[in-house]
């Protein structure tokens, strides 16, 4: 099995830590004035989603994770599973709620998602960075009500709740960043 040295560490690198695939979120090489150099890393476990900070001594090796990312198109959902289709082979894959996490609120028909497979099983689903959704419920924006610049909550067609500016009305289509859950703009 392949392995990576701390010299190879960079954000996005996937490796095995405590028997679970992880991805490096941040890393920093530290050379203290006294003592051995080390690499300070922030990792996210792909199955549990936990974020940890771990220090590796300089030159330490870690086992590479046999993790593969594939592009799939969201098809439909039943009681227990969400189904995705490969755009070229038309092969379908089912994903359970644990692998999907809270990303189900960003799934719309035909959305291009990245599914991460480990040992042939789906362990995570990454929705597109931006989605366009309809506002189905929000408070009316009152004229002159600008004391709080935080906006107002709006419920979208998938059930997600985001903060939107006061001028957004029910029925409008808005663009949302799925990574942060923030309103980006209205769609013309």
Curated annotation (Swiss-Prot):
It is found in: Cytoplasm. It holds the Pfam family EFP_N. One of its GO terms (molecular function) is translation elongation factor activity. Involved in peptide bond synthesis. Alleviates ribosome stalling that occurs when 3 or more consecutive Pro residues or the sequence PPG is present in a protein, possibly by augmenting the peptidyl transferase activity of the ribosome. Modification of Lys-34 is required for alleviation. Belongs to the elongation factor P family. One of its GO terms (biological process) is peptide biosynthetic process. Keywords: Cytoplasm, Elongation factor, Hydroxylation, Protein biosynthesis. May be beta-lysylated on the epsilon-amino group of Lys-34 by the combined action of EpmA and EpmB, and then hydroxylated on the C5 position of the same residue by EpmC (if this protein is present). Lysylation is critical for the stimulatory effect of EF-P on peptide-bond formation. The lysylation moiety may extend toward the peptidyltransferase center and stabilize the terminal 3-CCA end of the tRNA. Hydroxylation of the C5 position on Lys-34 may allow additional potential stabilizing hydrogen-bond interactions with the P-tRNA. Transmembrane segments: none annotated. Pathway: Protein biosynthesis; polypeptide chain elongation. This is Elongation factor P. InterPro entries: Elong-fact-P_C, NA-bd_OB-fold, Rib_uL2_dom2, Transl_elong_fac_P/YeiP, Transl_elong_KOW-like, Transl_elong_P/YeiP_cen, Transl_elong_P/YeiP_CS, Transl_elongation_fac_P. One of its GO terms (cellular component) is cytoplasm. The modification N6-(3,6-diaminohexanoyl)-5-hydroxylysine is found at residue 34. HAMAP family: EF_P. Its main location: cytoplasm. The gene is efp.
